[in-house]
Structure formats: structure tokens, C-alpha cells
């Protein structure tokens, strides 16, 4: 499995704001969108293009346009914070949803909803899950996507923990993870340290 940490001054600046416990909900949402834009730009670097003839105002020329079929699948609800930025850069992307809920007492995820486009085998599938902590939610979603034909899923996470990475290496070795940071590890409640808290709660003000 490939883990790619996106190193860029703008990523560091956005991450600093997301980590700050005093960042208000509205600012947190804007920062999440910016983080998504930066991660998506890196994660789509190798998408397939095709030559296309056009006319500029001055002369005919050949340009390259995106031809890859792209599917974005946010994990409800936290993954919704990455969807706006994704669609801003890839507006033609199809969108699916995986509803996953973590039992806070056991940190075990359960799947309660799924609605994804058909024929995932011929698509480049991006899973949007901003916090890769234990890896349970991501592994469950990737398993579900694989059952529907997806191969080589690209996981976009703002912060990852070594424990979550290790779990995916064992269960989903063909996945590529794009993240802004790999943090120290998990606490006894399975939250990432130093992390940024509960992403979904901070995104939605709950």
C-alpha cells in the first residue's frame, strides 16, 4: 500500500487552523474545503487525458482533456466536508455515499447506508474519509466498494494514524492513501493524537 503525505506550505497552514480547538465552525468548514482542494489536486495528478482539437480566439490548437471516469464516495457524515472541494476541481465526478457509524464505546464501525454509482470497475474511485484513526471505517467502506467492483481505491484523509495505516496495509494493500499528516497515534478512546478532535462534530457544530 502506498501512503503519500502531501507536503506543501498551504497544506501546513490549513492543517494548523483545523487543529486549533478555538477555530469556529464556519472557519473550520472553509478550511476543510481548502484541505480537500489541496489533497484532490495531488490525488488526481495521474488521471488519464486525451488530445482534443479546439479553436482559441487566435488559432486552432490541440489541448488535453480529462477522460477518466471519476467517482467520489464520502463517508457519512464527516466525509461530506471534503466533497465540496472535490467537486469544485472535478465537477464531472459521479458521487456515491457510504453511511458508517462508530460505536464510541468500542470504536467499531458499522455500515448503515450505501448508495454508489454502478460499474465501479471502470472508474477511478476516491473515498473521502478525513480521519484515518483505527482504519475500521475506511476498511469497511473499501470492502464494500470492492464488492461493487472498485479496484485501487484512493483514500483522501486529512490526518492519519499509524494504526489505521497498518490496518489498511493488511486488509487493502491495493489502496493509495493521500493525507496531510501522519500523526503520533491513538489515545485510549481511539482518537488521533495530536489530531484535531472529532471532525464531523467540528464540521457540523454538534
Where are these regions (language model features)?
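PRPP-associated nucleotide enzymes
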Residues: 1-206
Amino acid at each position: 500500500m502506498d501512503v503519500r503525505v502531501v507536503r506543501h506550505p498551504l497544506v501546513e497552514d490549513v492543517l494548523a487552523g483545523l487543529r486549533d480547538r478555538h477555530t469556529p465552525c464556519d472557519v473550520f468548514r472553509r478550511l476543510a474545503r481548502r484541505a480537500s482542494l489541496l489533497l484532490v489536486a495531488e490525488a488526481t495528478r495521474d488521471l488519464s487525458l486525451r488530445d482534443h482539437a479546439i479553436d482559441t480566439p487566435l488559432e486552432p490548437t490541440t489541448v488535453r482533456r480529462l477522460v477518466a471516469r471519476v467517482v467520489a464516495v464520502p463517508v457519512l457524515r464527516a466525509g461530506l466536508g471534503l466533497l465540496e472541494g472535490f467537486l469544485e476541481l472535478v465537477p464531472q465526478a459521479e458521487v456515491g455515499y457510504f453511511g458508517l457509524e462508530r460505536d464510541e464505546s468500542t470504536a467499531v464501525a458499522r455500515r448503515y447506508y450505501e448508495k454508489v454509482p454502478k460499474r465501479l470497475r471502470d472508474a477511478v474511485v476516491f473515498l473521502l474519509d478525513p480521519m484515518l484513526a483505527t482504519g475500521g471505517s475506511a476498511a469497511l467502506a473499501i470492502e464494500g466498494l470492492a464488492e461493487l467492483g472498485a479496484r485501487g481505491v484512493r483514500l483522501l484523509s486529512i490526518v492519519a494514524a499509524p494504526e489505521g495505516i497498518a490496518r489498511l496495509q493488511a486488509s487493502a494493500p491495493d489502496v493509495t492513501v493521500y493525507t496531510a499528516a501522519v500523526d503520533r497515534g491513538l489515545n485510549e478512546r481511539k482518537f488521533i493524537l495530536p489530531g484535531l478532535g472529532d471532525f464531523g462534530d467540528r464540521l457540523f457544530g454538534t
